Curated annotation (Swiss-Prot):
Reactions catalysed, as given in the entry: a quinone + NADH + 5 H(+)(in) = a quinol + NAD(+) + 4 H(+)(out)
Source organism per UniProt: Desulfotalea psychrophila (strain LSv54 / DSM 12343)
Top class in the EC scheme: translocase
Name of the gene encoding the protein in the UniProt record: nuoN
Biological process, per Gene Ontology: ATP synthesis coupled electron transport
Protein name stated in the entry: NADH-quinone oxidoreductase subunit N
Family: Belongs to the complex I subunit 2 family.
Length: 470
């Protein structure tokens, strides 16, 4: 039972909220219960860090590799809840149900990082995905009804990605006679000279690419980010990346290091994601849509670490995923606090933010600088390591193009910074009052993005150690 403790805590939490939907669906204490539950999940994840073992006949593995992701997910869930401003953007009558799906989605992600066969990975992926589909639809009613459109698009794209993934799984099983990752890693490298093996492996990646919003499964991101409530967008934009990168690294060990065609496919997806995301972000007026296209580009950067096909590259990819999650949570935290009513935040709405709340402005600017890859923040450290690793692996042209994309992204990030410091004399801006918890969250996010950028050694060592148990 100790091996399954974080997942058990999440399952019990979901059951508690299910009971609360019957007894106190509108209780103001729901958010407090959720915060306490997230702290419990973090504690149970930390307690299980040194545990190893297998469950369910080898389909579920507990190791340092899986447990480090569970700690990240636990901390991330707490930050999302702090970002959520008591989830005011969610329909009041469904708020208790929202918490159920929130914790079930995290449970699915935790199951993803521990799954050791492709069928278990699919089940965990679907648990997380279907919970998130419902979360998107539970936004407070919008005159344009964009939340319903976003939920339908999210569902349709997700089902399509799952269909591709299942198709690839069926061929892999037919070729190797196994669905477990260990036998697949033994047999698949010998089959990678066959077109059907390459095709099936590429199809297998569809579900992961969907979670990372990578080309060609990125189309859902802008509409879902725009249509979902700020709290839901903050979740969908961040925590699923942990589950996706954990599974993608496991998949990357299957074909062996000499499959040049797979490397070329990953390179193509990474570069197209970067160019498409950054070019589309240049013309966005809605802040959440801008961050969606930015996320597509950052997914391409994460892929640079994976296509190196060695632990050092995997370490860099995990570190950059952690950086991306922190940077985006910081941005969405600010977006949630300054959004008025149920409206989406436009770029022009950021005008005079520094005058209204210097601390919020500094938090937002720190997140933007980190996303842009400006030193000394965590985004710079992560990008530098990814580019250095890709260059060492011989991908010179890719590194040059990725560097160009970094320069391209500077334009729209620095434009947001400019607007934040601008003031509109004709429009009276009321000061934003922050509570003690909001101030503490701002300081925590700023400190995390700065200190992990300057002193990354400790977390990199922990990730390296975890990768030895992959």
């Amino acid at each position: 039972m100790m091996l399954f403790l974080p997942e058990l805590a999440l399952l019990i939490t979901a059951l508690v909220f299910f009971i609360l939907t019957l007894k106190a669906p509108d209780s103001p204490k729901l958010h407090g219960v959720a915060l306490i539950s997230s702290v419990v999940v973090i504690i149970t994840s930390l307690l299980c860090l040194g545990q190893t073992g297998e469950l369910f006949y080898g389909a579920y593995g507990i190791s340092s590799y899986s447990q480090i992701f569970k700690v990240f997910l636990g901390i991330g869930s707490l930050l999302i809840l702090l970002t959520g401003k008591q989830f005011c953007g969610i329909k009041a009558r469904f708020r208790a149900e929202y918490y159920i799906f929130f914790f079930l989605a995290i449970l699915g992600l935790m199951m993803m990082v521990s799954s050791l066969d492709i069928l278990s990975i699919l089940v965990a992926l679907e648990l997380s995905s279907f919970s998130t589909y419902i979360m998107v639809a539970l936004r407070e009613d919008n005159p344009r009804g964009i939340h319903n459109e976003a939920a339908i698009k999210y569902l349709l794209y997700g089902v399509t990605a799952t269909a591709f993934m299942l198709f690839g799984m069926s061929y892999l099983f037919g070729l190797t006679g196994s669905i477990q990752l260990a036998p697949l890693a033994e047999k698949l490298p010998q089959l990678m000279n066959q077109p059907i093996a390459v095709t099936s492996f590429i199809l297998l990646l569809a579900g992961v690419f969907y979670k990372l919003a990578l080309f060609p499964f990125h189309f859902w991101a802008p509409d879902v980010y725009e249509g979902a409530a700020n709290e839901t967008t903050a979740f969908a934009a961040t925590l699923p990346k942990f589950g996706a990168i954990a599974v993608l690294i496991r998949f990357a060990t299957l074909p062996g290091e000499n499959s040049q065609l797979i490397i070329n496919v990953l390179l193509g997806c990474a570069l197209i994601s970067m160019f498409y995301g950054n070019l589309a972000a240049l013309v966005q007026k809605d802040v959440k849509r801008l961050l969606a296209f930015s996320g597509i580009a950052h997914g391409g950067f994460i892929l640079l670490g994976v296509l190196v096909f060695e632990n050092m590259g995997y370490r860099n990819a995990i570190f950059y995923t952690l950086a991306y999650v922190l940077m985006n949570i910081a941005c969405f935290f600010v977006v949630s606090l300054i959004s008025e009513g149920n409206k989406n935040l436009q770029v022009t709405d950021l005008t005079g933010l520094y005058k209204r709340s210097p601390l919020l402005a500094i938090t937002f600017i720190t997140g933007l600088f980190a996303l842009a890859g400006i030193p000394p923040f965590i985004g710079f450290t992560g990008k530098f390591m990814l580019l250095a690793g890709a260059l060492k692996a011989g991908h010179l042209i890719t590194v040059i193009l990725a560097t160009f994309n970094t320069a391209l992204a500077l334009y729209y990030y620095l434009n947001l910074v400019r607007v934040t410091f601008c003031t509109d004399e004709e429009k009276e801006q009321a000061p934003i009052q922050l509570g003690v918890c909001d101030r503490a969250t701002c300081i925590l996010l700023i400190a995390s993005m700065t200190l992990l950028g300057i002193f990354p050694t400790t977390i990199l060592t922990i990730i390296e150690s975890a990768l030895t148990t992959l």
